[in-house]
């Protein structure tokens, strides 16, 4: 788990570096897109609103307990805010620098494992079939 947490930190720093390396126009477009999205006004991160699939469910299952609890809190708070048709105060909105892709390392590990499992599913034992 420590290596995956380190991977999340590397992904976060790489994401922030990419944001800094964008041209002025790219930064303005990204900021416009981000400020007009609704999920950041509810305090959610992008990976909190990814459509669920078996791969995403597996990645979420692999999250550390603290990260899972934080994710569940963000989703529950967003549901409550959405039901009451309100948003968070502007200072509590998710900032573009804080919207890191925290599920990426877990998704990559799950993809690799599924690919390896698929390769082994087609393995033919030479002793069984000479």
UniProtKB/Swiss-Prot annotation:
Flavoprotein found in the keyword field: no
SUPFAM superfamilies: 14 kDa protein of cytochrome bc1 complex (Ubiquinol-cytochrome c reductase)
Compartment(s): Mitochondrion inner membrane
GO cellular component: mitochondrial inner membrane; respiratory chain complex III
Major localization listed first in the record, in broad terms: mitochondrion
Bilayer topology annotation: Peripheral membrane protein
Example GO biological process: mitochondrial electron transport, ubiquinol to cytochrome c
Keyword Transport: yes
Alphabetized UniProt keyword annotations: Electron transport, Membrane, Mitochondrion, Mitochondrion inner membrane, Respiratory chain, Transport
PANTHER family the record matches: CYTOCHROME B-C1 COMPLEX SUBUNIT 7 (PTHR12022:SF0), UBIQUINOL-CYTOCHROME C REDUCTASE COMPLEX 14 KD PROTEIN (PTHR12022)
General function of this protein: Component of the ubiquinol-cytochrome c oxidoreductase, a multisubunit transmembrane complex that is part of the mitochondrial electron transport chain which drives oxidative phosphorylation.
Family membership: Belongs to the UQCRB/QCR7 family.
Subunit structure: Component of the ubiquinol-cytochrome c oxidoreductase (cytochrome b-c1 complex, complex III, CIII), a multisubunit enzyme composed of 3 respiratory subunits cytochrome b, cytochrome c1 and Rieske protein, 2 core protein subunits, and additional low-molecular weight protein subunits. The complex exists as an obligatory dimer and forms supercomplexes (SCs) in the inner mitochondrial membrane with cytochrome c oxidase (complex IV, CIV).
Identification of the protein by name: Cytochrome b-c1 complex subunit 7
Organism: Fasciola hepatica (Liver fluke)
Record gene name: UBCRBP
């Amino acid at each position: 788990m420590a290596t995956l947490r380190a991977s999340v930190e590397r992904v976060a720093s790489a994401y922030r570096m990419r944001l800094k390396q964008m041209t002025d126009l790219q930064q303005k477009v990204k900021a416009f897109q981000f400020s007009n999205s609704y999920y950041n006004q509810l305090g959610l991160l992008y990976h909190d609103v990814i459509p669920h699939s078996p791969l995403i469910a597996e990645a979420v299952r692999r999250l550390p307990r603290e990260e899972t609890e934080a994710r569940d809190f963000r989703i529950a708070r967003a549901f409550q805010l959405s039901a009451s048709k309100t948003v968070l105060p502007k200072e509590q909105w998710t900032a573009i620098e804080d919207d890191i892709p925290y599920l990426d390392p877990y998704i990559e590990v799950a993809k690799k494992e599924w690919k390896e499992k698929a390769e082994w599913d087609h393995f033919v034992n030479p002793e069984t079939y000479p």
